[in-house]
C-alpha cells in the first residue's frame, strides 16, 4: 500500500513543480522584458530610415510611448 502512495506523491510533486516553474519563468520573462525592451530608440530610428522615412525625434518619442503603453496594457491583461 505504501508503494502506490509514494508513486502518487511523486506524480503530484512533479505536476506541482511544472506548474510552479511555469509561473516563475513567466514572471521572470515579464520583468526582464519590462526592464530590457526588445526595441529601443536607435533601432526604431534605423527601421524608419530603412522604410524611407525621415525620423524626427518627436515621431520616435510618439512611437516609443505608444509601444510602451501597448506593452503595459498587454501585461495588465495577462495578469488577469
UniProtKB/Swiss-Prot annotation:
The chain crosses the membrane at residues 4-24. It comes from the Bacteria. GO terms for cellular component: plasma membrane. InterPro entries: EF-hand-dom_pair (IPR011992), UPF0154 (IPR005359). Its main location: membrane. Belongs to the UPF0154 family. This is UPF0154 protein SH1564. It comes from Staphylococcus haemolyticus (strain JCSC1435).
